[in-house]
Design a protein with these regions (language model features):
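Surface-exposed patches in structured soluble domains
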Residues: 39-43, 57-62, 68-74, 136-139, ...
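Extended amphipathic alpha-helical segments
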Residues: 34-36, 85, 89-92, 96-106, ...
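Short, solvent-exposed secondary-structure boundary/capping segments
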Residues: 231-244
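Short, conserved beta-turn/loop elements at beta-strand boundaries and strand-helix junctions
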Residues: 47-48, 63, 169, 228-234
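Hydrophobic alpha-helix/coiled-coil detector that fires on Leu/Ile/Phe-packed helical surfaces
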Residues: 26-35, 189, 195-202, 209-221, ...
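N-terminal beta-strand block that forms a small beta-sandwich/beta-barrel module immediately after a flexible targeting
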Residues: 17-64, 68
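Membrane-entry signal-anchor segments at the cytosolic-membrane interface
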Residues: 1-19
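Extracytoplasmic/periplasmic/luminal assembly and interaction segments
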Residues: 59-103
């Protein structure tokens, strides 16, 4: 009898252990299924690529690599010598055009005063000449304004608060208008993108709270889902010969869930965390 009770006790203990293990496994599975998470996350930021509006040799670089800059701080300057000459030339042209305009207008007034003596064609010609001179004067003023603007743009300033990154510009380098010479990471633009499996998207909604863990820090960041990506690449969408779709002739029976980018806006930033664009992150979306 004792042996039977002992055997039943062992069976009961085993069944209890299995039941507890099953319950724990179910709880973890449910949490995994209803709390989307991914280790495939990245810290992102807007990188402002700054190009000059005028071309010329760089005369001064006012910043260092990885330096903090405020909006409006000078980054570098282009040699302004030829730009100053352009301003002086435009000023001289404005003065010449102004004198010509005044002379033509005076001639038109004098012709108008004696219109009974001279022909109407002569009056019209002098009036047209005065109008053309006035238009030329306005054109000279515009050219002067453009020359002054180019001179002002010889000094390149930061449009945002942030960090100079990957600086390779040196005095003496030639800067071409429209060609990026300095890049700045906008300090106020950091966000996190998490790549979630498509099977988890049904549990992700805009506005839901997100917990972010960075690989290099112990503290967690808190944010919320700002948006969900609406498109990812398709390898079968390439264009082949004759403009026809180039569809892969083979199909793998092992179907892996596609990953969709989810943008996370950061809400709280613990002290001591220095965000760097490109850092690895794990992201969990709260129920």
């Amino acid at each position: 009898m004792k042996s039977l009770l002992s055997l039943l006790g062992r069976y009961a203990l085993t069944l209890s252990a299995v039941a507890v293990a099953t319950l724990v496994a179910f709880i973890f599975w449910k949490q995994y299924a209803q709390t989307p998470w991914t280790r495939d996350g990245r810290v992102r930021a807007d990188v402002v690529q700054i190009a000059p509006d005028v071309s010329g040799p760089v005369s001064r670089v006012a910043v260092r690599d990885n330096q903090w800059v405020n909006r409006g701080d000078i980054l570098y300057a282009i040699d302004p010598h030829w730009l100053k000459l352009a301003v002086l030339s435009s000023q001289a042209d404005v003065e010449a055009k102004r004198h010509e305009m005044l002379m033509r207008q005076d001639a038109a007034r004098r012709r108008a005063m004696i219109k009974g003596v001279i022909s109407s064609e002569d009056i019209q010609q002098t009036g047209s000449a005065a109008s053309i001179a006035a238009a030329n004067y306005q054109g000279a003023l515009t050219a002067l304004e453009l020359a002054q603007l180019n001179l002002a743009h010889a000094t390149v300033r930061s449009p945002v608060d942030g960090y100079v990154t990957h600086l390779r510009l040196r005095p003496g380098d030639y800067a071409t208008a429209g060609e990026t010479k300095v890049a700045i990471v906008d300090a106020h633009s950091f966000w996190v993108v998490g790549y979630f499996e498509e099977t988890k998207l049904s549990h992700i909604r805009v506005g839901k709270t997100a917990q972010i863990s960075l690989m290099g820090f112990d503290s967690q960041l808190i944010g919320h889902v700002e948006s969900i990506g609406r498109g990812i690449g398709d390898s079968n969408d390439e264009t082949g010969g004759l403009g026809l779709p180039d569809v892969n002739p083979t199909f793998s029976w092992v179907r892996l869930a596609q990953r969709v980018p989810v943008r996370i806006q950061l809400d709280t930033m613990p002290a001591g965390i220095e965000l760097v664009a490109g850092l690895s992150a794990s992201v969990s979306i709260m129920p």
